[in-house]
Amino acid sequence: MEKQFKHLSIFTMITLVALGCQTPQEDLKVSENSRTYQEVWSEFFNERNMEIVNEQFFTDDVTVVIPDNNIVGIEGTKNYYGNFLLGFSDAEFTFIDIFGQGDKLVKHWNFKGTHDGDFFGIPPTGKSLNLSGTTLILMEDGKIKQEQNFFDNLDMLTQLGLME
């Protein structure tokens, strides 16, 4: 009985290690996806280049998952994220960390800026925003297919002086 348990334990450990390891091809895919993703969003936010949201880097049916109604398509995605550039003329976007497996990436980010323009219909408050969050990303054939952002909305609204 003890011998069987020992063999089962060894088999279980080997299986878990094997399942948790990525192949060199998977590592390369994650690396390429991460590089592309970081280049696109750094160019968008820090160089203020909205035109980089295009069919070269995004699937036609790219989806931004949001609570009320998902944003679908390249133009919708460009307009959605464009609100951050319109609302914060000094927007500064930083990647804190990015990692992944296969076509899935996770991004930890920070966004800073002064609310000096229209932001999703909110008139300028002149307040500074320093917001961190996490994004789940799905890539397809080296293109961005889906994003879902997680951040503290109450903290954002409080920093903008809209909530107490």
Describe each region flagged by the PLM.
Residues 9-18:
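Bacterial N-terminal signal peptides
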Residues 98-106, 138-145:
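A short, structured loop/turn motif at beta-sheet edges
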Residues 103-115:
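A short hydrophobic beta-strand element
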Residues 113-141:
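Exposed beta-sheet edge and beta->alpha loop/turn motif
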Residues 1-9:
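Bacterial N-terminal signal peptides that target proteins for export
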Residues 35, 50-105:
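A solvent-exposed, acidic/Ser-Thr-rich amphipathic alpha-helical stretch
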Residues 145-164:
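Low-complexity, intrinsically disordered terminal/linker segments enriched in charged
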Residues 21-56, 60, 163:
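Short, low-complexity N-terminal intrinsically disordered segments enriched in polar/charged residues
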